[in-house]
Amino acid sequence: MRKGVDKRAMAALSAGHLFTDVNQGAVAALVPFLVAERGLSLAAAGSLVLAATLSSSIVQPLFGHFSDRRPLPMLMPLGVALGGLGIALVGVASSYPLILLCVVLSGLGVAAFHPESARFANYVSGSRRARGMSFFSVGGNAGFALGPVITTPLVLSFGLPGTLFLVLPASFMGLALLHELPRLLTFQPKAEEAAVGRKGAKAPEHWGPFARMIGAVTVRSFVYFGLVTFVSSYYIQVLGSSTLLANSALSVMLFAGGVGTLVGGPLADRIGRRAVLAVSMLLLSPLIYAFTVSGPLLGMILLALIGAATIGTFGVTVVMGQEYLPGRIGVAAGVTMGLSIGLGGIGAPIFGALADNQGLPTTMLAISALPLIGLLLALSLPRSPARSSD
């Protein structure tokens, strides 16, 4: 096994992750424009985020299951291209059902990309999987953060049809990944090693701790998507800020999450994955509450800390899942990166309905209470997979 991360291979995978998740970030950035120009309610807007989340996540374990049995590397270039095509068509869709369909199409492309790319991220990381997965994850974090940065100027300049430009970077990245595939394939385990891994004979699988960890990830996802969906609207409706400043605040949170990811991976290697996850949950409740009583500028500082605490553990939990299920790393990645996040995305329309009826300040307070549940679940996990028991 390699001692370190292969830089060229990881750069290709992380860049693919970035260009794929730009499309997911674009959905959240389009919410204020769709509300203003298409007359969508906050609940309907939240449902778009839910559709993007579910379509990009629920089927990920299925892709992971098939890739555990037979690798499907072509899903990486095809996934990023399809993700860009779907979101590009959102701005020219003439009705809410068509908008929803385009969002789902984009989400399916995202779903196809993630399990297979996470598998190869595991392969090219050698013995430093937490560090390698943090590099892979930060690509997705950066992509989600760039979604609003890229989308907002396009829509401000060209109207909603400006989303058509988003197909260009996705197509470019799809071709780049297609070019890199032959080299990436050299990192796959030998056939006999892969067969042993699929049977799970090398190490036991710990479904009990895995399920509890997924519970914590789901809670984190409720918090994450609640904030991603309504931070911009909170700035506009509660703090009286412009759309540009509102989406900038969202980008600050997401970019800080990328920094948190780079810190969280190496830190988890030193003090333990469980400790990093638990501390992040412990910090989130007071930080989100402080945000609700702050102005726009202090709010941005707090959002940076919130983003680091929320997003910084994404890579850590992917590695935890793969360690709990060492013979099913595709399924583990699909559930950790997909299904659990999709379940958390159910919170978007729930929080949207709460915001429509009780207001955004009350909604933010509700979001601030959730990390306490995640903290309890994180503390119930074993300190290492070797100590796990079902």
Question: Predicted segment positions?
Answer:
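C-terminal transmembrane helical hairpin of 12-TM major facilitator-type secondary transporters
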Residues: 268-317
